[in-house]
Amino acid sequence: MSQLDLNALNELPKVDRVLALAETNAQLETLTAEERVAWALENLPGEYVLSSSFGIQAAVSLHLVNQIRPDIPVILTDTGYLFPEAYQFIDELTDKLKLNLKVYRAGESPAWQEARYGKLWEQGVEGIEKYNEINKVEPMNRALKELNAQTWFAGLRREQSGSRAHLPVLAIQRGVFKVLPIIDWDNRTVYQYLQKHGLKYHPLWDQGYLSVGDTHTTRKWEPGMAEEETRFFGLKRECGLHEG
């Protein structure tokens, strides 16, 4: 697999970019997660960053990528509405894995947003999308720009939702290469990796949460629910970071 030209690919229409990366993706599908990270570091341009929501299985990608690329900037977009257990988990993993954590937030505080717009998450899909744009998308765009990122690693998996079921290992999003090393892992592989390396699930896992975001848009799993139905009242799965 030869080195890819990000500028040239960005000039192509989205469909043509997908086609241009098809052969590379076919080869990446045959590699292990660790090999995919190593390939990206050798063949894709820096600077390199890793994003994490510090969700249920976040320790996997944080450990895997950081072991191969120590001190890689880890981007967290903090809404200010995470569970207390989530903030404790962030502190724990940052210390345990010696993460180079970079926290980005909206320009307006949560209280100021509520004063201006009300509780956006209670205002249907449009309100949720505006909330995500303010608290997730804009801070992430700012992070990628300030960190001069050209290659972005993330821990998405196809098994997590229908919206992720057909994602490739390598794509271009927000003008940078996006690499998903564990995209084809199932829950069993995740569990085995955590056990092998002495890592833990998010503390809310034991309380019945399959996916964790903000306190006001996250529900415990109940029988008959798909994982994606536990977020955003089942109206949508993605927070905006991994769309577009």
Swiss-Prot record:
The encoding gene: cysH
Listed pathway(s): Sulfur metabolism; hydrogen sulfide biosynthesis; sulfite from sulfate: step 3/3
Pfam family, any one: PAPS_reduct
Organism per entry: Salmonella paratyphi A (strain AKU_12601)
Location(s), subcellular: Cytoplasm
This protein's GO CC annotations: cytoplasm
Catalytic residues identified in the record: C239
Protein name: Phosphoadenosine 5'-phosphosulfate reductase
MF terms (GO), sorted A to Z: phosphoadenylyl-sulfate reductase (thioredoxin) activity
